[in-house]
Amino acid sequence: IDEAYADFASHNSISLLSKYDNLIITRTLSKSYSLAGLRVGYALASPALVSVLDQAREVYNVDRLAQAGALAALSDRSYFETTKTQIIKLREELRIEFDHMGWRTIPSGANFLFTQPSRQGDSGPDTAADLYEFLFDREILVRYFPQNQLTESYLRISIGKPAEMGILMDRIKEWQTQEKRK
């Protein structure tokens, strides 16, 4: 089970470890600990399964810089908890804002929202593309997935710092008041 975003969710799968000997839960420090560039993670499993995984592990599987970053991040639990709580709070505030604007937003247990923007009654692929381009032109980067019919009307918006989220909302409100682009 991939639990890359488990720290932002209300539930996790750890209790399943005692029920299933063949279960492996993987986690990363990339998301909630903000160590994406260091590629540090870990696995949770039964002792027998950990032994098998350990036999396949490479000798130098985590470099010294990544080890130092991970140790520093893991040793400051207070900062982690404060940051995690802030991200969850900002995510919920943003979701509520989107709800008030009539956007469809998928429930999230991660550090991002997957939302279908709407403007002047239109919430199709052209609307998502238009907002994506509008934000990009203002150096605000969100993810857009036009290659799939299921996702072409949605944007994935990562949760940043409070000031960044304020700027994002200001730009979205500015976009909503503009005429549709041709």
Regions found by a protein language model. Name each.
Residues 45-49, 76, 117-121, 162-163:
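Short loop segments at secondary-structure junctions
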Residues 87-88, 98-138:
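Conserved PLP-binding catalytic core of the aspartate aminotransferase-like
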Residues 37, 109, 149-153:
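Short acidic/glycine-enriched loop/turn segments that link adjacent beta-strands
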Residues 3-32:
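Active-site pre-lysine segment of PLP-dependent enzymes
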Residues 134-138, 143, 147-182:
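PLP-dependent enzyme catalytic core of the Aspartate aminotransferase-like
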Residues 22-99, 103-106:
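PLP-dependent aminotransferase class I/II
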